[in-house]
Amino acid sequence: VEMFGADSSTDAKVMEFLPETNIVIGAAKAGVQVLSKKQLGEAKNLLVAADVNAVPPVGIEGVGIHDMGVELPETPQNAIGLGALAIGDIKYKLHLKLFEMMKSADEPLYVDHNCAFDVAREIVSKL
């Protein structure tokens, strides 16, 4: 997996990375739209668009703040959208479960990223 941050300040800069991107996470400051539906239409390899901006306008046009795996028909591969509050809900459930695990353990429990990821997968599988 290759992850990188990208400049999305202009349409031209977005189009330098978006057509080959599989997953995009919109993480601009509140109230800034990072990607439009028109741009998403050029994202030929996009599978997931996650937006962590819950302040209007949303960061990724077409992804609602409560969306959990909603199909984005404007994308060539019908990518799925994840909204900020849906992401936050999973994060909350994950934190709660990890705290419960720590509280019920007989000995100190140290949780690393791999453990947290496994627990998150378990939570998401039940949605």
Placement of each model-derived feature along the sequence:
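Adenosine-phosphate binding glycine-rich loop
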Residues: 55-127
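Rossmann-like adenosine-cofactor binding region
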Residues: 3-77, 81
